[in-house]
Amino acid sequence: MRLIPLKSASQVGLWSARYIVDRINGFKPTAERPFVLGLPTGGTPLNTYKRLIELHKAGEVSFQNVVTFNMDEYVGLPEDHPESYHSFMHNNFFSHIDIRPENINILNGNAPDLVAECKRYEDKIKSYGKIHLFMGGVGNDGHIAFNEPASSLSSRTRVKTLTEDTRIANSRFFGGDMEQVPKLALTVGVGTLMDAEEIMILVTGHGKAQALQAAVEGSVNHMWTISTLQLHPKGMMVCDEPSTMELKVKTVRYFQQLEAANIGRL
């Protein structure tokens, strides 16, 4: 597993955006052979989306032949609700780039049959062969997407009950009222993520330090779903300095030396 230790959340956003642009451009996607990109929501990737928009407007990348799959969506929120992940993605990314609407894939949390919707989503991903790069974030408790602690490490896209900790954390988007946060969500599974050709996890802030430590220095453990990244042949974590506070100094120095050339690309 790779660890890219940077100074700030802003640097994490810039580095990850440039990495995505380089992957897309290197792939040379066409309508018949699109680049397939997995995407998250939440506060952490906002810097990345901002930088991607800037790079697109500067003419450095086109998303016309990029197909996206989002990680998750709340159950029961209308798509046009301000806190739905459909709204989040439209407002913070999709409406600012040249992606084709038919290439955007987000789970439908209002589908009449949620189990069938999850199977449809898995089948749609498989129809493209694989996701080439899945970008994600991580929760304070180590969850990826809505794969909460004790999730099966081979899980597929499914309905999940959100923990109280996750609902409290997300209540900041709902006026601080946890009761307004849905109790259920649809989410890609850990196994779904692991099927991607490459996974890039963004980690910023002191609150994520314990999760980063578990992912990098701990054992693979279903109580820390992020630790599954150790088993991926192309797993990478891009982190800022505050999030490394629980790592051993020698661990951080090791990756600083190992990735010096890549860090220097900023």
Swiss-Prot record:
Gene Ontology annotations for the cellular component aspect, listed alphabetically: cytoplasm
Molecular function as annotated in GO: glucosamine-6-phosphate deaminase activity; identical protein binding
Pathway(s) the chain acts in: Amino-sugar metabolism; N-acetylneuraminate degradation; D-fructose 6-phosphate from N-acetylneuraminate: step 5/5
Leader sequence segment: none
Pfam family membership, one: Glucosamine_iso
Regulation of catalytic or functional activity: Allosterically activated by N-acetylglucosamine 6-phosphate (GlcNAc6P).
Highest taxon of the lineage: Bacteria
Subunit organization: Homohexamer.
NCBIfam families tied to this protein: nagB, PRK00443.1-5
Family the UniProt entry places it in: Belongs to the glucosamine/galactosamine-6-phosphate isomerase family. NagB subfamily.
General function of this protein: Catalyzes the reversible isomerization-deamination of glucosamine 6-phosphate (GlcN6P) to form fructose 6-phosphate (Fru6P) and ammonium ion.
Name listed for the protein in its UniProt record: Glucosamine-6-phosphate deaminase
Source organism: Aeromonas hydrophila subsp. hydrophila (strain ATCC 7966 / DSM 30187 / BCRC 13018 / CCUG 14551 / JCM 1027 / KCTC 2358 / NCIMB 9240 / NCTC 8049)
Gene for this chain: nagB
